Amino acid sequence: VVKQGLLAGRIPGL
């Protein structure tokens, strides 16, 4: 998820 990627840092798909 793109949103989750942003929350994780900036890794889309994480």
Curated annotation (Swiss-Prot):
This is Unknown protein from spot 108 of 2D-PAGE of thylakoid. On the 2D-gel the determined pI of this protein is: 6.3, its MW is: 21.3 kDa. It comes from the Eukaryota. The lineage of its organism: Eukaryota, Viridiplantae, Streptophyta, Embryophyta, Tracheophyta. Keywords: Chloroplast, Plastid, Thylakoid. It comes from Pisum sativum (Garden pea). It is found in: Plastid, Chloroplast thylakoid. The keyword Plastid applies. The keyword Plastid applies. GO terms for cellular component: chloroplast thylakoid.
